[in-house]
Amino acid sequence: MTIAKMIDHTALKPDTTKEQILTLTKEAREYGFASVCVNPTWVKLSAEQLAGAESVVCTVIGFPLGANTPEVKAFEVKDAIQNGAKEVDMVINIGALKDKDDELVERDIRAVVDVAKGKALVKVIIETCLLTDEEKVRACEIAVKAGTDFVKTSTGFSTGGATAEDIALMRKTVGPNIGVKASGGVRTKEDVEKMIEAGATRIGASAGVAIVSGEKPAKPDNY
């Protein structure tokens, strides 16, 4: 598998414009990225632009705080799928995890998984920078129990992004059959190779073109 096919080509900034989405989808076609990862408002346009392409549309749910109710997250998924999303990256209820309310954390994830089943792949963002190692392990275990397809490190909108150490811990926790996505601060081919070596099977990056072309990203980006 090429590096491009492991990258979710990402544009999640709040000031993203239509022109930027059109560029993003054009680049996805050109380079063969796994997906474009966009905010829900851009799912329909992205799906139209990628009709017939190998790249699919990924969107974010309960993003970036994860503090919506399970019912709201479930509706977001339903709406996203209707608009053409084939993958959804949801943020867990981080406060509930901190409170050791594992039942709520699981119910929250399961609400998304149940709606997406058979229609969209689910990635669960645990926001590693806010968690202890014990919490990272527990979050991954709950996500697997709830039926996720992937666990993912970060939103790119908090205090830190992906590290090789966190990827290795997540991979060890979920085993070989669940995907692990590294996101947040992955900007170069070397960064990607480090994450893959640690156990990542998907990369979230706004610097996708720079990564596959070997050029330096135009400017640093958290995502």
UniProtKB/Swiss-Prot annotation:
<dbReference type="GO" id="GO:0016052">
    <property type="term" value="P:carbohydrate catabolic process"/>
</dbReference>
<dbReference type="InterPro" id="IPR002915">
    <property type="entry name" value="DeoC/FbaB/LacD_aldolase"/>
</dbReference>
<feature type="active site" description="Proton donor/acceptor">
    <location>
        <position position="181"/>
    </location>
</feature>
<keyword id="KW-0704">Schiff base</keyword>
<comment type="function">
    <text>Catalyzes a reversible aldol reaction between acetaldehyde and D-glyceraldehyde 3-phosphate to generate 2-deoxy-D-ribose 5-phosphate.</text>
</comment>
<keyword id="KW-0456">Lyase</keyword>
<feature type="active site" description="Schiff-base intermediate with acetaldehyde">
    <location>
        <position position="152"/>
    </location>
</feature>
<dbReference type="GO" id="GO:0009264">
    <property type="term" value="P:deoxyribonucleotide catabolic process"/>
</dbReference>
<dbReference type="InterPro" id="IPR028581">
    <property type="entry name" value="DeoC_typeI"/>
</dbReference>
<keyword id="KW-0963">Cytoplasm</keyword>
<comment type="similarity">
    <text>Belongs to the DeoC/FbaB aldolase family. DeoC type 1 subfamily.</text>
</comment>
<dbReference type="InterPro" id="IPR013785">
    <property type="entry name" value="Aldolase_TIM"/>
</dbReference>
<dbReference type="InterPro" id="IPR011343">
    <property type="entry name" value="DeoC"/>
</dbReference>
<dbReference type="GO" id="GO:0006018">
    <property type="term" value="P:2-deoxyribose 1-phosphate catabolic process"/>
</dbReference>
<dbReference type="Pfam" id="PF01791">
    <property type="entry name" value="DeoC"/>
</dbReference>
<protein>
    <recommendedName>
        <fullName>Deoxyribose-phosphate aldolase</fullName>
        <ecNumber>4.1.2.4</ecNumber>
    </recommendedName>
</protein>
<dbReference type="GO" id="GO:0004139">
    <property type="term" value="F:deoxyribose-phosphate aldolase activity"/>
</dbReference>
<feature type="active site" description="Proton donor/acceptor">
    <location>
        <position position="89"/>
    </location>
</feature>
<comment type="pathway">
    <text>Carbohydrate degradation; 2-deoxy-D-ribose 1-phosphate degradation; D-glyceraldehyde 3-phosphate and acetaldehyde from 2-deoxy-alpha-D-ribose 1-phosphate: step 2/2.</text>
</comment>
<dbReference type="GO" id="GO:0005737">
    <property type="term" value="C:cytoplasm"/>
</dbReference>
